[in-house]
């Protein structure tokens, strides 16, 4: 077993060696290095063939038509293109959008920008389990609502929203539905042939593919129109100009092909690892699981260790790569906005750690990690006067602290 141990698979995943091999073949002079837009010679034709093959592989994982897959630089760009693209194209129909308070910053910062442009956005508060229900969305719908954007799997707490039920509602009301699927590919079955989803964002690097490449599913039936954000050579049917990065695209295609083949077996194995980890830490006092216990992916275990500061616990777990909050926002010392939206108090939100397991996690690593967590939590609590007061039966929430 090699240290440190990587338990932050929701932040990014290592590229699968099979994916890396396919990518290398598209880089050098001996390989498939041409520009897919070069129509006048064989180098371009071969590159275009590789790009279209990858498009089919991505479409196959999510049961879409390959013509509905638009290449982007990642899920952040896909979210921007979907939300701004719809808002700007359909602004004459209405200027109201609906999303939730627990979305990724790539959605929330995009809607904030639209608010500055004069759009109105309703931010739905989730239940204590972190889930967004169709009834919550129904209550927020207005005559001028043009788009609902709700994530499939939450990046911090791993909860799975019922996008099938939400899609039925939005379609019946004639409102477009965008789903951020960055965290769900390879973890949850996605059948866009039957789901009433109009737009869906994907990322390669959360599914053992390379960083810097993603895709946006844009429904053809019913047809969805978008205003482009990148202008240039008219690539991707005018929706996203820019020379296609063949090696990145081929990597994403191969990653999604592997995900389709291995997802069922991999999920069973990862659930066993997650259960194994939880069984070894669940006897710690004042331990809370954040998010629904049932509607969640097995890869994610977000735990709050009351009376332990999350950042100090991460420091104590120097052999484990884990995070507090999402990788995109954990640089700030604010408690997780996702956990706050669930109704967790600041103390519990600050004491949360996200453990995420993946393809290369082993039982040996899990056992070592669980042992280290138990030792660190016990040691840090022994140093905490708040823990002593709690053990003495003092209700800490009733204490009035003196101002300095």
Swiss-Prot record:
Pathway: Cofactor biosynthesis; iron-sulfur cluster biosynthesis. It comes from the Bacteria. GO terms for cellular component: L-cysteine desulfurase complex. The modification N6-(pyridoxal phosphate)lysine is found at residue 206. Its main location: cytoplasm. Homodimer. Forms a heterotetramer with IscU, interacts with other sulfur acceptors. PANTHER family: CYSTEINE DESULFURASE, CYSTEINE DESULFURYLASE FAMILY MEMBER. This is Cysteine desulfurase IscS. It comes from Pseudomonas syringae pv. tomato (strain ATCC BAA-871 / DC3000).
